UniProtKB/Swiss-Prot annotation:
This is Phosphopantetheine adenylyltransferase. InterPro entries: Cyt_trans-like (IPR004821), PPAT (IPR001980), Rossmann-like_a/b/a_fold (IPR014729). It comes from Pectobacterium carotovorum subsp. carotovorum (strain PC1). It catalyses: (R)-4'-phosphopantetheine + ATP + H(+) = 3'-dephospho-CoA + diphosphate. Homohexamer. The gene is coaD.
Amino acid sequence: MTTKAIYPGTFDPLTNGHLDLLTRASRLFDHVVLAIAASPSKQTLFTLDERVALAKGATEHLSNVDVIGFSDLMAHFAQQQNANILVRGLRAVADFEYELQLAKMNHHLMPTLESVFLMPSEEWSFISSSLVKEVARHGGDVSHFLPDAIVSALMEKLR
């Protein structure tokens, strides 16, 4: 049986922490879709098309990963993709309550959809896209936290 997993998020922008989880998921599952959410309720710095393009560039070395933008409910997107696994990262205990609610709702909407939680590597456990953007906005060096092409795109966007 082929396993297909979806790793969803806004990824505004994709960080090395996200990339670490994605790389690890790509070793666990036959195929992984990095599903980039339109997230109209969030004020994203990058458009959906920009986030998809940046993520495609950062993941081209992962042969079993596809990057796809979506604006549907996650459960509906998973059905469209014939996937039955959601990969989510848990950085801290604070993430758990929200992730548990999401997992329960997604399972209610699609009973065959299972959520699998991965812990970030210690190096990336404190990183979030929001934090990286905030540091960059104030002139801090974020090159350790983002793939090179995304660092350039972020600096350009913040000019």
